[in-house]
Amino acid sequence: MYSKLVSSAVLFILAFNLQSQVSLSLGSGVLKGFGIPKSFLGFHGGFELPRNNDVTLYLRLGYYLPRKEDDTISTSVTAINPLSSPSTLTVNYLTSTNYTTIEGGTRYYLGNDYDNGFSVYGGSNFMLIINSVKRNYEKLDATGVYSWEGDYELPEYEVPKGTILSLALGLQGGVKYTFPARGTIYADITGNYTLFGKASNTTAQNTALYAPMIFIFNLGFRKDLY
C-alpha cells in the first residue's frame, strides 16, 4: 500500500510538469516528536519541480529507524502441548517504533533563484506519517531458563505488530547554496501537526514513542536535471 501511494504521487507530479527541469535530492535527518523522550535518525529522498524561478513543488520520502522504549513489559505465553511443563511462562519484551513520512508541498525561494547561489526558502506542506510498532520478545523466559518460541504461544488477544497511519499539515523553512554545474546543499526544518491518526490495534495504540506533533531537521544534496 505504501509503495502505491509513493508511486501515485510521483507520477502525478511528473505528469503535471513533464517538460520542466526536475531535481533529485538525497540526505539524512533527525525526527523529534514533541513530548516523547527519543529522537529518530533517518534518511530521505525526493523530487522538486520548479513552477518558476522562485516557486517549486516538492515531494519527499523519509524513513527514520526504529527506537526501543526504555520500559520492559511482561506477558504470559502458554504451552502448545498441554502436557508440557511448565504450562505457562513469563516473557519480557520491549516495544519499538519507527517513522515513515511522505511529504509534499510548495516552496518559495527568497534571495537568489531556486537553482542559483544562496537562498532561503519556506512554505506549507502535507504529510502522511506511517508508524510501524513491534513488540520485541526475548528469546528466553523471564527466568532465563526456558526457550519458548515454537513451543509456547502468545495470548489470543496479543498481536506482536501494529501500524499507525496519520495525516498532518505543517510548515517548512530552510537554506540552500547552489554550486554552479555541480549541485545544491541544503538544510531545512519541518514542523507538522497531525489532524487525523488511526491505530490498527492495541499494540500500536500503546506505543510511548508516537507524537501528534513532530519536527524534522534535514541535511542533504540536490542535483538538478535538465
Predicted regions and their residues:
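Predominantly the C-terminal beta-signal and adjacent terminal strand-loop region
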Residues: 69-70, 176-226
